[in-house]
Amino acid sequence: MSIRTGKVSSLLQKELSSIFEKELPRSGPLLTIVEVKVTADLGIARVYVSLIGSEKERGLLMEHLQNETKYIRKLLSSRIRHQFRRIPELEFYEDEQYDKARRIEELLKEALNRPGEEQTES
């Protein structure tokens, strides 16, 4: 990642976080912008979001984000249009690291709480 794309990614993440917090508040799953990756030509911004909620709620919110992409891009444009010639297209992806970490935690707890199993040394 070049310095320029890194700065653009950071700015987009900050502005999108602010948009979701202040201009598009929703009840339902908690939404956090984990990372924004911008293509080298700055034409596409891939926005990775972490969602905490039920599977159904998360699915509905991802669908909502896909449907509202143009509106979100318009809000973003109104904030940063003086810094860019062209506002990147937005693509939203669910970041599943939280779910993976939670599943690993559950498996570890389950393994540690199994009664009657003795560990042997090799």
UniProtKB/Swiss-Prot annotation:
SUPFAM superfamilies recorded: Ribosome-binding factor A, RbfA
An example molecular function term from Gene Ontology annotations: ribosomal small subunit binding
Protein name from the UniProt record: Ribosome-binding factor A
KW GTP-binding (keyword) present: no
GO CC annotation terms, alphabetical: cytosol
One annotated GO biological process: maturation of SSU-rRNA
UniProt keywords, alphabetically: Cytoplasm, Ribosome biogenesis
Subunit structure: Monomer. Binds 30S ribosomal subunits, but not 50S ribosomal subunits or 70S ribosomes.
Family affiliation: Belongs to the RbfA family.
Compartment(s) of residence: Cytoplasm
Organism expressing this protein natively: Prosthecochloris aestuarii (strain DSM 271 / SK 413)
